[in-house]
Amino acid sequence: MKKAFRPAFTATIPVLCGYLFIGFAFGVMLRDIGFGSIWSFFCSLSIYAGSGQYLLVSLLAARASLVTVAVMTLLLNCRHIFYGLSFLETFHEMGRRKWYMIFSLTDETYSLLCSVKTPEGIDAGDMRFWIAMLDHSYWILGGVLGTIIGGILPFDTTGIDFAMTSLFTVIFVEQWQSTKCHIPALMGLTAAAVSLAILGPDNFILPAMLAICVMLVAMRGRLAKEVA
């Protein structure tokens, strides 16, 4: 288990940089509506959904009901269901740790688990577990720092939630550069663009994910040859 820590930490450095900043932004926004570091800690520990927590700040500010918060968070993060489908067998082999892996499967962690290569002599399950735990700890740390520093120094939070979009863009570019097969990426861009144009920004995510899954299944034979 300990041997896998160093390569896992190295692999998660980009997420460390992004999560500290994005988590910090979340913490500042949470402090801005009157919640302190304890709230940030337990929110990031138990919810752990970047976009969902950003939405949570808006809903808390509007004094939305718990039912509204739960439904909106589910709709916003239901894309994670599709992530989990590709790791059913992998997580099952990890024993009791699979429950934490399911919980901690964020966009960035999923991206790393799909692309990272386990060094020789390192257990792949241990490395995946460390990646998930490290990413989670970065997010918690960023949020707590945001609420603490946000309470000391004044911040203008206008546009600060764009940090999440920035991180997604960086991860997409890194994955594009690390592989020769760009068909899945082009599928994703096309499906998202068409869905956005037809359904608008409030309703495009789930249909786009469904379209991407259908296209990937339909072209799995060709994609397997391209990757090989």
Task: List each model region and its residues.
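Membrane-water interface at transmembrane helix exits
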Residues: G27-R31, L88, T118, G146-G150, ...
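Helix-loop-helix junctions within the multi-pass membrane cores of secondary transporters/permeases
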Residues: A70-D161
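Membrane-embedded alpha-helical modules
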Residues: G125-P207
